[in-house]
């Protein structure tokens, strides 16, 4: 009897401390830009799923992509990045956005993103949603930096533990010296963000692209 009681006690303890993982996916018009402070990998972007811990808060940045209009008036609408923060769940979750059929609807979505998080069985999960405001010449390249600043601000959908997240291929601003690549880390200098970003993306490009850009720059002096 004592042995049985010990076994039952251990089983109860293990059950009470166990964590369960659910899969998170999105509606077809959403793409992941960041997951829990990290850039969404290309392979993950195609699969559009990742695993979450049901005991933790999770945060994703998504963007809505939709072909709007009809016939010769069709165009691609890309929303501003949207932050979604939610509690993990043992059941699979789906992050969804409504279908956008015209640019007016797209503008309304940008002003007030309508994004929901539900379990596969249809139960709504509480989520905090906010727009990730961005500036600069190439805002899409600064998602992680902007997200880290957002998380440090204490805003509505922020998660403080992700505030210190750094970009794997980060842009380091050098106080002096010419822009150069150093062991995979791009080092730039400049008087403003736009100049720094130009230097960063120039160094990311291949030689042919760099040459074409330089020729273009010369022709626009």
From Swiss-Prot:
The keyword Signal appears for this protein: yes
Q: Does the keyword S-adenosyl-L-methionine apply?
A: no
Stated family: Belongs to the UPF0319 family.
Q: What's in the keyword line of the UniProt record?
A: Signal
Q: Give the InterPro entries listed for this entry.
A: UPF0319
Q: Which domain of life is it from?
A: Bacteria
Q: What is this protein called?
A: UPF0319 protein HI_1681
Q: Supply the source organism for this entry.
A: Haemophilus influenzae (strain ATCC 51907 / DSM 11121 / KW20 / Rd)
Q: Where is the signal peptide?
A: 1-21
């Amino acid at each position: 009897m004592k042995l049985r009681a010990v076994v039952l006690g251990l089983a109860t303890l293990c059950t009470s401390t166990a964590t369960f993982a659910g899969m998170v996916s999105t509606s077809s018009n959403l793409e992941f830009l960041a997951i829990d402070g990290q850039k969404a990998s290309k392979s993950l972007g195609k699969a559009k799923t990742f695993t979450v811990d049901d005991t933790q808060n999770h945060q994703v940045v998504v963007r809505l992509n939709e072909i709007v209009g009809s016939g010769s008036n069709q165009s691609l609408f890309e929303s501003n990045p949207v932050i979604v923060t939610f509690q993990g769940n043992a059941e699979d979750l789906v992050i969804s956005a409504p279908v956008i059929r015209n640019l007016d609807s797209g503008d309304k979505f940008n002003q007030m993103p309508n994004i929901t998080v539900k379990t596969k069985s249809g139960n709504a999960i509480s989520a905090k949603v906010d727009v990730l405001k961005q500036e600069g010449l190439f805002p899409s390249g600064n998602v992680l930096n902007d997200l880290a600043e957002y998380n440090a601000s204490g805003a509505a959908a922020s998660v403080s533990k992700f505030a210190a997240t750094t970009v794997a291929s980060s842009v380091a601003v050098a106080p002096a010296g010419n822009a150069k690549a150093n062991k995979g880390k791009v080092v730039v200098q400049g008087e403003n963000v736009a100049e720094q970003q130009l230097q960063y993306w120039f160094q990311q490009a291949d030689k042919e692209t760099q040459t074409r850009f330089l020729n273009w720059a010369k022709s626009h002096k």
